[in-house]
Curated annotation (Swiss-Prot):
Lineage: Eukaryota, Fungi, Dikarya, Ascomycota, Saccharomycotina
Cysteine disulfide partners in this protein: none
Biased composition range(s): Low complexity: 180-218, 338-358, 667-679
Region (Disordered): 145-269, 281-322, 338-367, 387-423, 557-603, 637-701
Function description: May be involved in the Ras/cAMP signaling pathway.
Protein name stated in the entry: Protein GIS4
Localization (cell): Cytoplasm
Compositional bias annotation for Acidic residues: 222-233, 413-423, 577-591
Gene designation: GIS4
Amino acid sequence: MQKSVRVGDYFDNDDNGLWSWYLTNLRLGDFEELIGNQLKYTLLKRFLNSHFYGDNNISARPNKKILLVSIPENVHEDISILEIFLKDYFHLEKLEHIQISKLTHSHCYNHENHYLLTDNLNNFQDPTFLEFASTSWQVQKNSKALNNNNRNSIPPPTISSSKASNGKLESNVSDDQWSNINTQTSTATRTNTNTRTLTSPDTVDINVTSVNSQSNNNDTPQDNENEVDEEDATSSIVLNFSHSRTVDSKPNRLPKIFPSYTNEDYTPSHSEIMSIDSFAGEDVSSTYPGQDLSLTTARREDESGQDEVEDHYSRVSHDLGDESIDQASYSMESSVSYTSYSSSSNSSSAHYSLSSSSRGNPKRENIDHTNATYVSELSSITSSIDNLTTSTTPEEEDNLIHHNYDAQGYGSGEDDGEEVYDDEDLSSSDYSVLSILPSISICDSLGYFRLVLQSILIQDPDTKEIFTAIRQSNNKPTMASVTDDWLLYDSNFSMNNLQILTLQDLLDIKRSFPKILFYTMVIVTNSGKQVEEEFKNPNYDNREGISKEQPLDSELSLTNDPQQYFPTAYNNGYNDYIDDEDDEDDGDDASLSEQSGPQMYIPTRMESNVTTAHRSIRTVNSIGEWAFNRHNSVTKIDKSNSNELDNSKTGESTVLSSEPHPMTQLSNSNTTSSNFSHSLKTKNSHKPNSKGNNESNSKNELKKIKSSINAMSAVERSKSLPLPTLLKSLSGIDNPTHATNKDRKRWKFQMNRFKNHKNSGSAGTDKSQRCAIM
């Protein structure tokens, strides 16, 4: 008889069930299920083949990126949030080529919906989408393959200065500029404010036919082989902004160790780092042989960047239609935000320039691209990443971006506290540097959300081996940082082939492999109005210690400072008493005197049992002590007017304002109550003594009881058990008066009677009383 096989796969075989199965087992660490379930594993490989290699051209290595975002099911404006995510962080003004597919239709697993974000046309307008720093990492064979693949989708355009042939190109772009673009490449389709559109694929030759006689005669169309030799290092820290610059050939890398800056318009980076010159021969899948290192002098000490910023700012203030500025402002630039080309091209480079090559007038001199200075993209964002936190608010991001560019000398566009850029430019550039982080904040009228990168699926296009990178959350799955470690597993999840990398190393090693990035959305707040009010609050900076996972306006958050827990059921008299005593407190106990009032979980606002634990946070040493503490917490005495309040039946606690320093007395309540309990136990254990000794002991005990009545009354005890009959009679709770001599005599008489009954050995009364105490 065959053994029954236990099947743990309860997911459907559609795309939603496939990725729910994959993410569930990945989060649980059940790698055996990911390998052993042949049905789901076959569906996974079929999905990757259909989305990564849709054109059946496997050798092309498209370096495609797919985003799979998991959004909680209680977020109803999911599509709108994803559009905001794409527009603000990826600078995608036009979303008609991007497909946002909702995979969850019938079954919703793990209370989350899955969305697939793909761009089959141009890979989110950047073939190097979501890569850190790499310069000409593709070899000539891969570049030619990319050219062939891109030519099948988008033909290379022929640009002319004739207004009749191309009406979208305005006259503010001169023919001299377009005649020099044939040595560079542009990426994607970008739509600016003047509705001018450039469409040319990455690493595709742009042959320019110049019809203007004033164009430069030295610039002629080049062959594809020459284009590959002087390949444009179109790489970016993230997303869809291109960095068009030339890189010298491999034998000439040695002179770059000590570069000389020949152009005054170029302002290097603020920091000085060692950057990796990514000139790899072949793409490697399992090993990382290392690449040549070059010293990048990011900034010279004798170089002042402030004068250059003012020079850039003065150029921007000129007339936008001046042809002399347009011709002199030609440069090979790499800017974060693509500003409107109605202004000069130099203004866009003065706004947000991360790295650029030598600049100059093409009419006056021929630029030696071979000796152009190479600056890694990482050198320009090192200071930003080091100062970033995982939960960065939009205003903090805004201040960080402006501060970073001011320090680097690139010109943040501020002069005497006035901003030059409008809101549209800021909204498209503030998040560009921060989008590389595994944690991305989205603040809108819909709410305050955070996208956290949890894992990455990578496939080798040659061997079809599937790699899995998992971020180590350190017990914080909703918080991410650039300093987190990533574990890179092979297709078998073997522990012998496990690599620990950073996110930068991971994306740099597997830079030419297609990837699927798994993001998880975290709800910080459901309403954006609360967040905006918190941003306007000047005390917001002091709240850095509070976790972002809690609501910003929460009144139920607990601090690390020592607190005194108060009962949840208190009346107005107790509140008035607390307010009066705060002004009179001498501050003997600083930790207790700082508390202005009770801070508790209110059952009407939070239906949980946590309040029960807070009530019993203080312990007692005996049942007798508990009984006296409960009695003293129920009954309060007014020393000024000698009014007696009987609350034993109602169970309400009232503290009058005439009692001095209750917080100080409260700190000594345990000691006083324990002393009284010890004396009571000692007295019960003693043998019968003389009558004089009994009277003297009773007087001392009465004094202790009187002094401890108010000290043990700050914390209300549980109301589930009634006060024992014996202790009720001993305390004199049934008497109308309590502070007179008559009450003292009555108290003394009752204590003596209790002693006599005990010494006489009356069985019935003695046993009942002892049972009441026990």
